[in-house]
């Protein structure tokens, strides 16, 4: 059983809007959330490195800080990364809305491609934060499922 057709349509639309390969974006979604729009995961190392200093310096509330330490939605966009990319919804849980999550996720992924001369392997490793050296190969192996 594959992903719901409406999610595939939204993923392809968001990818195209950012001049990304729709099959690659669908592969990222499969890898990150298995097409579960409500997927979320707390990333303690990310929180400690990137978010805790904001909270410690009273730049954000405790609730907002902890939400920024989670990855959200279909593309598992980190809350902090979404805010840095201009995501303005009151609550970061709005990233679980497929259209909003895919839109901001593709915007962030496009920035990774632009920063890394369009190299898919390097852009995917940057997307994943570099913690998993096999991440890019795993995503690229799934790409053919969405052609």
Please report, for each region that a protein language model flagged, where it lies by residue:
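Catalytic glycan-binding domains that act on GlcNAc-containing polysaccharides
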Residues: 1-147
């Amino acid at each position: 059983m594959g992903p719901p057709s409406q999610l595939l349509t939204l993923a392809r639309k968001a990818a195209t809007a950012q001049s990304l390969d729709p099959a690659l974006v669908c592969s990222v979604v499969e890898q990150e959330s298995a097409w579960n729009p409500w997927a979320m995961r707390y990333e303690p190392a990310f929180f400690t490195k990137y978010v805790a200093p904001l909270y410690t310096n009273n730049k954000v509330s405790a609730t907002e800080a902890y939400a920024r330490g989670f990855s959200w939605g279909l593309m598992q966009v980190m809350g902090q990364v979404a805010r840095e990319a201009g995501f303005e919804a009151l609550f970061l849980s709005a990233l679980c809305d497929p259209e909003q999550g895919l839109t901001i996720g593709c915007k962030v992924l496009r920035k990774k491609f632009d920063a890394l001369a369009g190299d898919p392997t390097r852009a995917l490793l940057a997307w994943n934060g570099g913690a998993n050296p096999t991440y890019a190969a795993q995503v690229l192996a799934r790409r053919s499922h969405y052609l």
